[in-house]
């Protein structure tokens, strides 16, 4: 099982916040901070999922991004 975590701070004028929140919901991401003109989003998943989220958020203006590398754990046996 492999996962990565990303935190993305994105420009979010009040009139565009609902659009950004909808995008976050599609990716099962969380809004972890709300600023005057920004939202910070936390998402976990594989590389493709996180790149997809970042690609969509880029249209709003990404202020900051921080991303872990892959973390992994072997699956349990099914016996």
Located regions from the model:
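Long, contiguous binding/interaction regions
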Residues: 1-79
């Amino acid at each position: 099982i492999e996962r990565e975590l990303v935190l993305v701070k994105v420009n979010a004028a009040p009139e565009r916040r609902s659009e950004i929140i909808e995008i976050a919901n599609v990716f099962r991401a969380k809004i972890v901070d709300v600023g005057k003109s920004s939202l910070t989003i936390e998402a976990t998943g594989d590389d493709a999922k996180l790149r997809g989220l970042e690609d969509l958020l880029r249209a709003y203006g990404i202020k900051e991004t921080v991303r872990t590398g892959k973390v992994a754990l072997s699956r349990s046996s099914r016996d």
